[in-house]
Regions:
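Interfacial segments of alpha-helical transmembrane regions
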Residues: 1-12, 66-81, 144-149
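Membrane-interface loop-to-helix entry segments
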Residues: 37-59, 108-129
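Structural signal for the C-terminal ends of transmembrane alpha-helices
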Residues: 61-68, 129-139
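Helical transmembrane-bundle signal
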Residues: 12, 16, 57-60, 80-87, ...
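Active-site beta-strand/loop microenvironment that shapes enzyme catalytic pockets
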Residues: 74-94
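Alpha-helical transmembrane segments of multi-pass membrane proteins
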Residues: 13-28
Length: 151
C-alpha cells in the first residue's frame, strides 16, 4: 500500500506543478489585470482544463484500486495532495500568495469559487486525513485488495 500511495502522491504533486506552471504563464500574459481580464476563449479553455484535471485525478483513482470505496478514498486523497501542492508550487515559483488570507479563484466549475487561500488548504487537510483514515478502516475484502496491491 505504501508504494502505491507514494506513486499516487508523486502523480498528484506533479499535476500540481503543471497547474501552477499554467498560472505562471497566465499571470505573464495578463499581468495585474486579474482573471476577469481574460478573453472568453481563454476562460472556456480554463474551464475545460479544470475539467480535464479532475478527470485525470478520477482516472488515476479508478486505476489504482478495484473497489468503489478505495477509488473514492483515493480520489479525495490525491485531490487533497494536488490542491496543497499547487499552492506550495505557486509560493515557490511566484512568491504568491503573500499570506493565507490572500484571495484566489479556486475553481471555475460550475461558477467561479473565490475565497481566502487558507480555505482550500484547511479543507484539503481535512479531506487528506479523512481519506487516510478510510484507508486504515477498510472492510476485510478491501484490506485484501490493498494487501495484494502491495505485492
Amino acid at each position: 500500500m505504501r508504494r502505491r500511495l507514494t506513486a499516487l502522491f508523486l502523480y498528484a504533486a506533479a499535476m500540481a506543478f503543471v497547474e501552477s506552471a499554467v498560472v505562471v504563464y497566465l499571470r505573464a500574459l495578463y499581468p495585474r489585470r486579474g482573471f476577469t481580464a481574460v478573453s472568453p476563449l481563454i476562460y472556456r479553455i480554463e474551464v475545460l482544463r479544470e475539467a480535464a484535471t479532475i478527470l485525470m485525478l478520477l482516472a488515476v483513482a479508478y486505476l489504482a484500486f478495484e473497489t468503489l470505496t478505495l477509488r473514492v478514498a483515493t480520489f479525495f486523497w490525491i485531490f487533497a495532495v494536488w490542491d496543497v501542492s499547487y499552492y506550495v508550487f505557486l509560493k515557490l515559483l511566484l512568491g504568491w500568495p503573500a499570506s493565507l488570507g490572500t484571495y484566489d479563484v479556486f475553481f471555475l466549475i460550475p461558477v467561479p469559487w473565490v475565497g481566502p487561500v487558507w480555505l482550500p488548504l484547511v479543507l484539503s487537510l481535512a479531506v487528506f486525513i479523512a481519506a487516510s483514515v478510510a484507508f486504515t478502516r477498510l472492510p476485510s475484502h478491501a484490506r485484501h485488495e490493498v494487501a495484494s496491491a502491495s505485492n
